[in-house]
Amino acid sequence: MKEFLNNLNYGISAHEVSNEFKQILRELLANNIIKEHKNRYYLNNGYVFGTLDISSKGTGFLQCFDESFKKDLLIENKNLKGANYKDIVAAKLLPLKKKRPSANVVLVLKRANETSLVITKRYGEAVLGMNIKTGLSTALKASQKSLKALPLGTILKIENQDNNIIEVLGHIDDESVDEKISLALFNKNNEFSDACIKEALANGDSVDASMYENRLDLRTLPFCTIDPIHAKDFDDAIYFDTEKRELYVAIADVSEYVYAYSAIDKEARSRGFSIYFPHIAIPMLPRPLSENICSLKPHLDRLAYCFKITLDLDCKVVKEELFETIINSKRRFNYDEVDEILIQNPDLKELSWLYKLFEITKNLRKMRLKNAFEFRTEELRMNLDENLSLKSTVFEKDTPSHNLIEDCMLLANKAAAKLIDVGVFRNHSSADMKKIDRLLNELLELGIDVKLKPNLPELIRDIQALADELGLRAEVDKLIIKAQKKAEYSSVNAGHFGLGFDKYSHFTSPIRRYSDLILHRLLKAKQKKDEKLFNYLLLNIQNTCENLSVLEREADKVAYDFMDRKFARWAAKNIGKKFKALVVQNDGICIAKLDDEIKGADIILYDTRVNLLESVEVQILEADIIMAKIYAKITQRLRKESNV
């Protein structure tokens, strides 16, 4: 469709329009979006086509197909005309009154999703559905008698085409409904089809080693897994031979169980990624695979795709070998346990290799960061009680164990990327210099005066050094990340700017990332010199990569939406109370992040005259549980950054 719509910019004749687009052509004519001239159809001035993105606040952003528009067009909630997330729409440009170009939706050309979520509300004598994403009300295809039989506040899934009710998800007062809402808003599903479950169960729950005589048997090696404390899907296990200086990175061999174009594969492709909520994971693969036969559980034989990476005394890679193996992990660690071992008990004989590996990865990290960036990012961990109410939050920082695993995985991912010239790469482009220039202006207001220089890694390190002096490193790192482009998947290698790698891919998480599963299949086909299979696996690979980049962002949005809902429920119980917060956005809408006993919640401030990264005290005035928004006013300015 994108190609058809773009052709209207230059004119397209009637016979060039396929049957697929003739109805759309008629609708465009009826709405005066296009005109006919000498048997050719042209887009009228002032109209654009694009894909709609909608923020958590209900504001629309149109990603224009016309590449001359360098920035997304702002579409206010009232101008969405019923359009939803990822819909392809025709929009009319509005007179430029603000800095950001804006438009309003004229016609929805293609629905991205067949369904929407609404909550029942009374409007006068009638019960209507209010769209949870946009806040717009709509009449439902059901009798008022049946709608009034439902308690107000019932969450319904409806068809976008005719507003027919498909499913009752629950009631807004029930906190367990949040998970269903977050998944349904982005068209995600927790359940697997009967065909997927049947395929998964057919693999059994144990590995018979006698069936895999051609695999390298590494079961005697003392592999271990290191994961979060509540993890069930163990993708990777490691072992380091201290005498031979050989690092083994064993990855769950999912491709042995999930064949291309099988029912599970089609479902995994559509999901793209596992989604992680604080209380549960929504897996990419059925649980009999993700949490059982594929998971590298301790003391069980498991199939693994394993890199053996040999390092010299200077910690440089001298050899990389890839094998189909069978392993038996000897121990399952969580990160906290390994941190304690590395810091307090480095002399444990049975784990001496782990401590020596840690010393090596510290050197690897030091060498890598000469050409890469190190950001002090903090992952928000939310703890819920038995009723799924917010109990506490904590920001988890990188620890020695996290760094150890990260650098081992980077070695394997980098090694895998070297083996292919086309396939699945993880690319990260150099930063947009306009965004960097804007960042420098923002930092100047904080007292961080850094002059623009052509060497971007050097520039960022200068910024970080000054941020360290001001005690603002973590906050400034987030601004730097925001100014950079997002990493994406592509069939063609373009390097990874942030990591400083010429070539990079994702190999180490096939249980939770579809990109890694594709790469495993490609590598196996290449090792077997099966060119026919390799090319077969490459069919539509660029489209697949582009779709995976979209699915990755969606998976993040689902997780963030769920947390926003829990924060909003917490705020509703704390109306009128005061908390510390940090201003993280002050361009147009002013937003602060809660920085008190509860951390990380986005607070929309009614006050706009406030400095970026200023610490303030806020009083919660309103919590919208339906739209997952919190509103507050500033009661005290605790610190101005210019005085830091």
Regions found by a protein language model. Give the residues of each.
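Electropositive polyanion-binding surfaces
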Residues: 9, 157, 181-182, 195-644
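Charge-lined substrate channels and their catalytic hotspots, especially those that engage the 3′ end
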Residues: 1-251, 255-301, 569, 606-617, ...
